[in-house]
Regions:
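Iron-sulfur cluster-binding electron-transfer modules in prokaryotic oxidoreductases
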Residues: 1-204
């Protein structure tokens, strides 16, 4: 089911409620203990905080982000990564909904240190990190494209200061916005999802 929840972004509570209810109904039917949010800041926010208010009750399950789950599995020794580490100079963009609102700051860094031999922080990282420019549904508004590209200038300064060979993030929305802006500025910088990077280095 769609979890990003365009209803919340549009301010339409009925659509928002319907989208959350589908996930809740499926989770209850399966009697799951956890619903794992993917690399999407808005999905995590919609399910974790907005969802119970929209459906009018507390969940019988827990919503966790994929990064929280991966970090937990690593700590429990249930997944292991290869001894060979990624040698590229990488940095991490903190998605606003996941980090600032969700408080998931340490987990992505724990995972990055497991797979990267050259991870470097940007200035003002974590809860102080600068938005990608597409937050609050701005990425869906074509009229805001010029402003979105302009606001990326602040993020570009952060990136230029550390000179990464790859930019890692954990939100599909951030990734799309960052890729568009990087292309607009003619930067040679691949954007990776943290989950896919970890997957590359999982030990069989």
């Amino acid at each position: 089911y769609e979890a990003t929840n365009v209803g919340i972004q549009m301010g339409d509570k009925e659509i928002a409620r319907t989208l959350v209810q589908r996930i809740v109904d499926a989770a209850e039917k399966l009697q799951v203990k956890y619903v794992v949010s993917p690399e999407c800041g808005h999905a995590y926010s919609a399910l974790n905080w907005e969802g119970p208010n929209l459906v009018g009750k507390n969940y019988d399950f827990e919503v966790i982000h994929i990064l929280e789950l991966l970090d937990q599995l690593v700590r429990e020794g249930r997944i292991k990564t290869k001894s060979e580490l990624d040698q590229r100079r990488v940095t991490f963009h903190d998605p606003c909904q996941i980090v600032r609102r969700g408080g998931i700051v340490d987990e992505p860094r724990n995972l990055l240190h497991m797979v990267s031999d050259n991870f470097i922080e940007m200035e003002n990282y974590g809860v102080a990190n600068i938005c990608c420019g597409g937050g609050g549904g701005v990425s869906s508004n074509s009229r805001a494209e010029e402003l979105r590209i302009k606001s990326f200038g602040a993020k570009k300064k952060q990136l230029d200061a550390v000179g990464p060979e790859a930019l890692v993030t954990a939100c599909g929305n951030c990734r799309n916005v960052l890729e568009e802006a990087i292309d607009e500025f003619g930067m040679d910088l691949p954007v990776l999802g943290l989950t896919e990077l970890v997957a590359e280095y999982l030990d069989d």
